[in-house]
A protein has these predicted regions:
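Hydrophobic-ligand-binding modules of eukaryotic lipid transfer/binding families
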Residues: 1-19, 106-110, 140-143, 151, ...
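Hydrophobic ligand-binding cavity/cleft-lining segments
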Residues: 2-50
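Intrinsic-disorder/low-complexity, polar/charged segments enriched in Ser/Thr/Lys/Arg/Asp/Glu/Gln
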Residues: 11-19, 48, 60, 71, ...
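Sec/Tat-exported extracytoplasmic proteins
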Residues: 22-24, 31-38, 57, 65, ...
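Hydrophobic pocket/interface hotspot
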Residues: 26-31, 61, 76, 87, ...
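Short beta-edge strand/loop motif at the mouth of beta-sheet-based domains
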Residues: 34-73
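Hydrophobic-ligand binding "helix-grip"
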Residues: 51-52, 67-114, 122
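A conserved amphipathic terminal alpha-helix motif
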Residues: 116, 122-161
Length: 161
């Protein structure tokens, strides 16, 4: 399920939800293995293997660049293993606009081998042209990311991580 529950000139909210065929621990572990599911087309380097996500105080969803540089995509602000992962920051083209965002993944066990994953990204801030025009592209990218995440969990080794 996907929805854009709020789209305003000064912000928007993107929400996606799906069920994955693993328990909450495996679902959470795969969230952290972001290089296994993030679309390389939505990186600066074009290489998903350059991505990392550290679930620790001040942890980073970061990307190493070939020239020795890096990109801090988001900063980890809440990590509750098996339950919630929240990151703060502005993804992609939002970064240079000076807006803020909160990306939250919530995991809810439906049964022993089925977890509901909800992605919610709330963005706010003022820009000269407003943020309404960015809501649908961000919704598309994050919806695709969550689908890739779910597909990666269908791999035979997913439940063993």
């Amino acid at each position: 399920r996907a929805e854009l529950p709020a789209v305003e000139p000064d912000g928007f909210v993107v929400r996606h939800q799906l069920d994955v065929p693993v328990d909450k621990a495996a679902a959470y572990a795969r969230l952290l293995a972001i290089a296994r599911w993030w679309d390389p087309a939505h990186t600066y380097s074009g290489r998903a293997e350059s991505l990392s996500l550290t679930a620790a105080p001040g942890g980073c969803f970061c990307e190493q660049l070939a020239d020795g540089g890096f990109v801090e995509h988001l900063r980890v602000v809440l990590a509750q293993p098996g339950t919630t992962l929240r990151l703060a920051g502005a993804l992609g083209p939002l970064q240079e606009l000076g807006v803020s965002g909160a990306l939250t993944f919530t995991l809810q066990e439906q049964r022993a081998d089925l977890t509901r994953v909800t992605l919610r990204y709330a963005v706010s801030g003022r820009t000269p042209k407003g943020l309404e025009g960015l809501a649908k592209p961000v919704d598309f990218v994050l919806g695709r990311a969550l689908q890739r995440y779910a597909t990666s969990l269908a791999a035979p080794d997913a439940a063993r991580e």
